[in-house]
């Protein structure tokens, strides 16, 4: 309750300081979505995207992002793109991606620190968009861990089911896994359904 009141007062008296976090497992499309938001409203990207897991290993923040709703409302927030959360980071997965052993071990160490930092940053979040890959099993241990941490902190959540442009995408499975949350299917890469996503952000933050 104390965390909830802290976030409520911060939104009430300092709306420009509202923090919207993008959380999710590695390679779910968090940075792709962050780049889509920043390009749509600021004309520039936020971070680098890669097919190799844990490309984002440090928290990245873009301040003063202002979006507009269909009915003309404006919402300003600080967008926080976090490293992918994993229950285990093994340097061997980077070896399989073709990295030299020394670089793979360094990447694994950085990725582990990134996971810890992501969890720490949760206490500063006013709202969170959990970005899930709609082509993968939503009942994974890491997804349950992320949702559990958010529930424990009473942080408002919307789920973005990403990659719905792919044939294997299964929105119904995600909806069945997390019926307590609003879920919007998007393709961050191609911008599919992105306007509906922005409307969800307005509802999430309560603007």
Locate predicted features:
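Conserved G1/Walker A P-loop phosphate-binding module
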Residues: 1-98
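Charged, glycine/proline-rich intrinsically disordered loops and linkers
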Residues: 88-115
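Conserved nucleotide-binding/hydrolysis micro-motifs of P-loop NTPases
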Residues: 55, 84-86, 135-137, 163-167, ...
